[in-house]
């Protein structure tokens, strides 16, 4: 699952507009996957098990059909990569935990603009969510 932020330019109703600079604007180059990740997605996007999902909140579960897709397929463990460790990855991990999914976070494949928040989140995944951080 490629859960990608989807925002509208200057959306005054979205809470992130007041918190962060414009990012992942629908139709913009900034919303594209980067480098080899984009290559892998383009090569595999037509496969049945590859799913692009727009998300408008921090958690990939919020306002999406992610839980339904996972449960339909009998998936019980989610593997998380991406940015930001202490924002979107964190909120997705918390929702996954609350919905009963096992969690694996790849520490070399998550990042944040806040190093302290990044390190805190990695520990939180282990100590509060029982996640594996590999």
Where are these regions (language model features)?
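Short beta-strand segments at enzyme active-site cores
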Residues: 1-5
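Active-site-adjacent betaalpha module
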Residues: 10, 14-134
């Amino acid at each position: 699952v490629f859960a990608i932020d989807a925002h509208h330019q200057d959306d005054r109703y979205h809470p992130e507009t007041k918190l962060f600079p414009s990012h992942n604007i629908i139709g913009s180059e900034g919303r594209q996957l980067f480098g080899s990740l984009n290559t892998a997605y383009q090569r595999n996007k037509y496969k049945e098990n590859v799913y692009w999902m727009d998300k408008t909140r921090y958690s990939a579960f919020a306002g999406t059909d992610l839980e339904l897709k996972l449960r339909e397929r009998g998936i019980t463990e989610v593997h998380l990569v991406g940015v930001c460790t202490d924002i979107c990855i964190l909120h997705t991990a918390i929702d996954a935990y609350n919905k009963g999914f096992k969690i694996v976070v790849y520490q070399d494949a998550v990042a944040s603009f806040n190093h302290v928040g990044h390190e805190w989140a990695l520990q939180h995944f282990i100590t509060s969510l029982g996640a594996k951080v590999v």
